[in-house]
């Protein structure tokens, strides 16, 4: 057990980490052009934040949170999602007092105790964006656009955007009465979880993936038929923004998401090539969450995207992430003096921005050159007593095998100019 990662976790080795770096770099580029600023929140929070924010009827709170009592007697939870901590930071640091909206993004590990399966680990990584302070449906459309832009730039084109409105507390109260009346006649056929949801938050029954529950809810009354004028207008406005951007979408009344804080907009983006497990992004609006967590009455909207699931989706679609280029220069040496000299030379060239490697294993010259090939080095030089004396080396282009003699002082500029 000592040499094995805990169940539901995974090491990201160098053979895979370049993929993460590429995606995270693209995320940062996209968020920058959209005007989102990065926020980093702690890995754990007071449990009460998630009880109030995520909602006590959710599977996350009821079954999946990693909660413990610390040495000070406080109930602490490893964060299971990114929105509530971002809201807490927004309130704690009085960001609501600044000119709005506040546009944030994060890339963070999150923790949920659930059955490990493909794309769903107990520790996984989430990319999310949040817009606080904007009630217009244009903010909803903007966060959707961020997600769609990332997915399309990664090469995922066969996407399906599904949208819904889950209403506000006023119109949802009326809908819940109608829904409970509908479900009451089939209560015995609902799964045990949905029997609890029926009492606490019946809307969540629509989100159940159990087949017997889905058979019942497929004939359930549609929440879109019970929206108040404000929610209906907001949903229509969102569709206009999506239309003007040229995004195809499907109105799906079953999209309610698995968190209690959603109001009005709820959406999912699905990779159609993958099928039922193809949801790569989900989010929506949460106009009551900031106030629920102790802040002022301010609207919010955002999404979360699991990076493990995204990487699997790319792989299943045959999309390869470009591997990083090899080192710029490998410096081989012969002799003890050259060993010290090349160490200093490598350090100088690295400081000036070149990717340089040299041998730290005291290999033979032949073995050093073999190592240079393994590193996919673009260029290589060999420095020995004669090269140090003459201040000249043969710069070998490892890609084509050609050589050119240059002074040691020319190495940096010559490589940068090629």
Curated annotation (Swiss-Prot):
It comes from the Bacteria. It holds the Pfam family HGTP_anticodon. InterPro entries: aa-tRNA-synth_II, aa-tRNA-synth_II/BPL/LPL, Anticodon-bd, Anticodon-bd_dom_sf, His-tRNA-ligase, HisRS-like_core, HisRS/HisZ, HisRS_anticodon. Its main location: cytoplasm. Its EC number is 6.1.1.21. It is found in: Cytoplasm. It catalyses: tRNA(His) + L-histidine + ATP = L-histidyl-tRNA(His) + AMP + diphosphate + H(+). One of its GO terms (cellular component) is cytoplasm. One of its GO terms (biological process) is histidyl-tRNA aminoacylation. Keywords: Aminoacyl-tRNA synthetase, ATP-binding, Cytoplasm, Ligase, Nucleotide-binding, Protein biosynthesis. GO terms for molecular function: ATP binding; catalytic activity, acting on a protein; histidine-tRNA ligase activity; transferase activity. It is an enzyme of class 6 (ligase). Belongs to the class-II aminoacyl-tRNA synthetase family. Homodimer. This is Histidine--tRNA ligase. The lineage of its organism: Bacteria, Bacillati, Bacillota, Clostridia, Thermoanaerobacterales.
């Amino acid at each position: 057990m000592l040499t094995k990662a805990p169940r539901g976790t995974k090491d990201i080795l160098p053979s895979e980490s370049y993929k993460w770096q590429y995606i995270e770099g693209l995320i940062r580029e996209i968020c920058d052009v959209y005007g989102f600023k990065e926020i980093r929140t702690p890995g754990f929070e007071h449990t009460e934040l998630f009880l109030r924010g995520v909602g006590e009827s959710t599977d996350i709170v009821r079954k999946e949170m990693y909660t413990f009592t610390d040495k000070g007697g406080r109930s602490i939870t490893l964060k299971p999602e990114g929105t509530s901590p971002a809201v807490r930071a927004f309130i704690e640091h009085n960001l609501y007092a600044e000119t709005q909206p506040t546009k944030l993004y994060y890339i963070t590990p999150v923790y949920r105790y659930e059955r490990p399966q493909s794309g769903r680990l107990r520790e996984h990584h989430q990319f999310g964006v949040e817009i606080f302070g904007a009630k217009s449906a244009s903010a909803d459309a903007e966060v959707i656009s961020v997600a769609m832009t990332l997915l399309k730039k990664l090469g995922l084109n066969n996407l399906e955007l599904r949208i819904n409105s889950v209403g506000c507390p006023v119109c949802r109260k009326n809908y819940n009465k109608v829904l409970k009346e509908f479900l009451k006649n089939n209560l015995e056929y609902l799964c045990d979880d949905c029997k609890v949801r029926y009492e606490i938050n019946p809307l969540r029954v629509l989100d159940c993936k159990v087949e017997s529950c889905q058979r019942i809810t497929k004939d359930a009354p549609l929440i879109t038929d019970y929206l108040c004028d404000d929610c209906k207008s907001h949903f229509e406005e969102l569709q206009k923004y999506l239309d003007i951007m040229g995004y195809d979408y499907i109105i799906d009344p079953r999209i309610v998401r698995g968190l209690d804080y959603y109001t009005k907009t709820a959406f999912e983006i699905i990779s159609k090539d993958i099928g039922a497990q193809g949801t790569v992004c989900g989010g929506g609006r949460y106009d009551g969450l900031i106030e629920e967590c102790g802040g002022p009455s301010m609207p919010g909207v955002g999404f979360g995207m699991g990076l493990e699931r995204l990487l699997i989706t790319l792989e299943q679609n045959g999309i390869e992430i470009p591997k990083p280029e090899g080192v710029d220069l490998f410096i081989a040496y012969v002799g003890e003096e050259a060993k010290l000299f090349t160490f200093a030379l490598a350090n100088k060239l690295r400081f000036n921005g070149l990717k340089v490697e040299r041998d730290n294993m005291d290999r033979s010259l032949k073995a050093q050159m073999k190592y240079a090939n393994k590193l996919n080095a673009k260029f290589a030089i060999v420095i020995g007593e004669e090269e140090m004396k003459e201040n000249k080396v043969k710069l070998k282009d490892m890609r084509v095998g050609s050589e050119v003699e240059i002074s040691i002082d020319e190495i940096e500029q010559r490589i940068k100019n090629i």
